[in-house]
Amino acid sequence: MMKKLRMEYREHFLGGTDCRRLGGGLVAGVLILVLSVVSAVPNSKLDSQIVRALSESVCGHQLRHLQGNEGVSEVIPPRLKGEWMSMRCEVRPGPEFVLRRYKFHSDSSFSLHQFFYTDNQCRNPAYSLKIRGTLALGQQSWVTSGATEAEYQVSKVTMVVYDEKFGKTLRAHVNLTCPGFFSSTSNDLELYQRYLIIDWEQEGAYTDCTEAMDFAMHELQIVRNELITEFSTQLAKFVSWEELYLGDIHTVMAQRMYYRPRAYQPPLRKYQANCSFCQFIHNTEEFNPPLLGAKTEYQVILRSEWVSTKCEVRKVHFVTRHLVFHNNFTWEGYFFYYLDPMCQHPVYSIYVKGTHSDGTRSEAVMGGTEFEFVTNQMWITPQNVMQVEKLNNNQDDCARAGSWTINEPQEVTSTNGCAAIGVTLPHTEMELMRMELGVGGKPLLFNGLQSTDEELQGLVVPTSYQSPLMHCAGVNPLIDITVTSQADDENGCGGLAASHYTLSMLLLAAWLVLYLRH
């Protein structure tokens, strides 16, 4: 595949057999421009501020696009009727790898399918749950801005097991809490057989052993419905779809039955006939679980710049993020906090600097890479009057009390952070990360979802992920521009084809700096 792509790239951009001649011209062009730049810049050093401004422009545009959630409109009250499904293999705390297919009906009843897998690509099914019940929407949430509260009742839950090893483990675990619940004499559960977990639909019947399975559907307690509209360059027209956000689940499985959600899980997308992935999930059921195709797994290389893809919800505020990774194990982070789910009303922003370790493959979460992040410098910028008052009332543990003014940043490193917003320095945090190629070929970076238990935040390695960040500047870490095949080298253009992208970028950067200097 790589060879084929290189051949097409060479034919299109390098002119086949003329690649050496064109490549030599390109190198010469770069050298001439670099010499011009060196002669124009004092001490032969590029102006780091110009380079920085150039690298930030795309990222800054994306952040401005998120401020106000351009192209996103809230649907009030939520339109639940219809079929909703996961758009990727979701990683839940635990970890659990899951695909969801939820149906809500006009009579307030629902039929929900949850498919669980033993792998992070949702290719090897372990078991599934089919949940039936009713849901009633309530008032706007006082806890999570933009969410609608709901009350639900589960009437029946059935389970189908697909994996023999998982079935044996589940049977032993459940029978410890509910002796005899799985009453077969064998230690194994029958595969592709429906087991009854809850049944309140039959009069006089009572079956419930959900506590042993850490089962809860409290995600139905808060609901948010959004309509997304964006321009499709492929179709040359605007396209729209709906997304459904349901409540988050506790990161400690044993606490799920007692936790009331305050944030969201990844959104579900409403079924559309022109959505091929939707169609694929739509055609599955408990005896025919969805099996996703294999995807490339990328090594997590922390470099370049990354920015939020949406206005993200937190348990207190909403946030957009901009992370910058350097090649010397240092990093910077910009965090912009808002009062509202459209990220229109700013509260404060934080700028931090620190270091990070090299990554190690996670033993707990398949496909994940673990890091240790240290934050040792911090600046805070209050962006509304209430936040200024809050910071000015500190006990000299968040810069000097009374020194804060709106939209003026202050460093809080000397006071070891800022107690008013609950941050201490230096701060060490265990991280989990993974990378994937998103829609349209954009690299995505997922970093860990911290523990719901505040006392454990940063101390334990996450087992699930936050909303992804999108690559916005710097070298694309998912493009390998150095590896060439033997056949390429025999044609005499392998190394040149591989380095053409790098040379093009050097040429562009040199020209831009020279242009700005004059």
What is each residue range found by the language model?
Residues 57, 87, 120, 176, ...:
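Extracellular secreted precursors and ectodomains with disulfide-bonded cysteine-rich loops/domains
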Residues 474, 478-504:
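C-terminal GPI-anchoring signal of eukaryotic secretory precursors
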Residues 42-99, 111, 135-136, 245, ...:
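Tryptophan-anchored aromatic micro-motifs
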Residues 46-50, 67-69, 75-80, 90-174, ...:
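N-terminal glycine/threonine-rich, aromatic-flanked beta-hairpin/loop signature
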Residues 21-40, 503-513:
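Cleavable N-terminal signal peptides of Sec/SRP-targeted secreted and luminal proteins
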Residues 1-21:
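N-terminal secretory signal peptides that target proteins for export/translocation
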Residues 111-113, 150-154, 237-253, 332-334, ...:
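Short, hydrophobic/proline-enriched secondary-structure or compact coil segments at domain edges
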Residues 153-224, 374-431:
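Mixed-charge, low-complexity intrinsically disordered segments
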